[in-house]
Amino acid sequence: MTRIAILGGGLSGRLTALQLAEQGYQIALFDKGCRRGEHAAAYVAAAMLAPAAEAVEATPEVVRLGRQSIPLWRGIRCRLNTHTMMQENGSLIVWHGQDKPLSSEFVRHLKRGGVADDEIVRWRADEIAEREPQLGRRFSDGIYLPTEGQLDGRQILSALADALDELNVPCHWEHECVPEDLQAQYDWLIDCRGYGAKTAWNASAEHGSTLRGIRGEVARVYTPEITLNRPVRLLHPRYPLYIAPKENHVFVIGATQIESESQAPASVRSGLELLSALYAVHPAFGEADILEIATGLRPTLNHHNPEIRYSRKRRLIEINGLFRHGFMISPAVTAAAVRLAVALFDGKDAPERDEESGLAYIRRQD
């Protein structure tokens, strides 16, 4: 039996472990953090499944992977025994009256990103009021993107950990290690450490991509005074933001994307900007309880696409570069990595790319 160690127990590591364990492989998972996943980038994320909205800035490959991943998430959730939220009510884009020109620009970017006309639906104020009663009087029109959805990321992380326990996968939480620590004990290693693998990833001299962290700041608030039925994005020239409603009146709010690898707490200024923009969406948010303002580093490659690399000599597969799109694209990316892994475990030649996802398999020379 091939012995496999997965380094990194964030979202990608847990999904990879689940898929291999379901196929009967002998897996062990190692992570520097605890079972809840607080050290993972996914723990901070809003977990929106928004390939249409992200087409405004994301690469075509990321958008394609995002579209592939939504049905994959449905299948994954069916295999989890722990409750998880998955909402497929689309998303709503709104703006204040003075910022209406931003909506035309947004639509142009959507179409340039390959979003079809029937995926871009204009809602008037009465249509917003019917579907989002607490927003209808505040916004005269909006854009509805019907193909989008969201998860509760923290529920997913917990449910995946439960599933690994049910499959008797040894999970070594609070056990930080690097590939060299485990190579003598295991036949193959799969590195899913994200930003934690920066030194190892960038040490591969023959490979062109470089890994860095991009900082994000996300607030969580609680208020029973507001009900939203789908994620809402506010277009704004200075403070664009998204609001992702979770169960039990919790809302995840984010906006910032900072070219910094600082892991310091959020600043007063960035917190004020985020919460002021939230208050402008609806003043009832002014009475919300602030549960946390968290920061995280998203593992980002210079081309902003994910990559799957492998080395037969080192018996190592590496998955990285999911950037801020972890929940949106991880099912497609990890499924592609698992297909590569199975081929390598069986001693077969690796194809140049994965047929289903289109992702390239990059062979390291070391």
PLM feature segments, named:
Residues A46-E127, R131:
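Dinucleotide-binding Rossmann-like beta1-alpha1 core, especially the glycine-rich loop
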Residues E57-R67, H96-L102, I143-A159, P265-S270, ...:
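Short beta-strand to alpha-helix junction loop
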Residues S12, R35, G196:
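Conserved Rossmann-like nucleotide-cofactor binding loop
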Residues R3-A28:
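N-terminal Rossmann-like FAD-binding beta1-loop-alpha1 element of flavoenzymes
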Residues E22-A42:
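Glycine-rich FAD pyrophosphate-binding loop
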Residues L18-Q23, M48-L49, T84-M86, R193-R314:
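Active-site substrate-recognition segment that forms the wall
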Residues A288-D366:
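C-terminal catalytic lobe of FAD-dependent flavoproteins
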Residues G142-W188, C192, G196-T199:
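Helical element adjacent to the flavin cofactor pocket in flavoenzyme catalytic cores
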